[in-house]
Amino acid sequence: NRATGTLYAPGSTFKMVTLSTAIEDDVASESTTFSSPGTITIGNAGVSNFNKTSYGTQTLEQATWWSANTVYGQLGVQMGADKLVEGAERFGFNQDLDFPIVMYTSLMAEPSEMTEWETAWAAAGEPVNPMNHESPAGPQATVLQMAMVGSAIANDGVEMKPYLVDGVYNANGQRSFTAQPEKLRTSISADTAKRVRDILKGVVKQGTGTAAQINGVEVAGKTGTAEKANSNDSWFVGMAPADNAGVVVAVVIEDGDEGVGTQKSHDILQTALEVQGLI
């Protein structure tokens, strides 16, 4: 099952984790400003925006809308590897999860082994390992892990334990088992979760995620493009309705064109909302 048994570079969807950590730990706020050149040198190596686009001066909120790697690289260095990894672990990275089928553990590197350049790229969602250190490069995530990140943000910072079987019916059509919601952890405060959701609304309203818009329903989410040697994976993690989510999705399209993950997520979100009677 590739949703639970494959590790991917989460690309810019991981910026939800970096953003949440920055706000939760008072490293930066929505209105903190950064310079966003197309390429910047951090730790004696380059960090670049997609297509090396320069955005001038941006707030952290705006940098999230447009997914500016050079801003998130600076933010990662500002918070440091320790805080970045701790923030990811609050969402479940480096944590084993008891699950009915094979579930790979999503990974972050050991902070003491991370270079400044590696920390910058990790904050932007790209795992690099320039020193070939003993711990794995990070972030690496399952699709389910990124869905759980989205769910925690949608659920006022509380991450619930995932399950596969919602109910069991006997031969008479009577329900003999009903799964009960179970809290797994508190990843961030309710205030941080709301502030992050407000920023993610802007991603869909006017940023890189406009293809996820649904008429009559406010959607919040984060796009991602994970670069590989010869192709990219296209990501989207989204929630709707944004402030009272009935649905959270995480989609990765392997070797997908830019934006296709967002388009597919739109279709899934819309269908799920229709089934629930929310649209």
Language model feature labels by segment:
Residues 1-6, 20-253:
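Beta-lactam-recognizing serine transpeptidase/beta-lactamase-like catalytic domain environment
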Residues 18, 83-84, 265-268:
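Generic structural signal for hydrophobic residues
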Residues 146, 258-269:
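Short, charged, low-complexity patches
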Residues 175-180, 265-279:
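Short, gly/Ser/Thr-rich active-site loops of penicillin-recognizing serine hydrolases
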Residues 230, 243-245, 257, 271, ...:
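Intrinsic structural disorder
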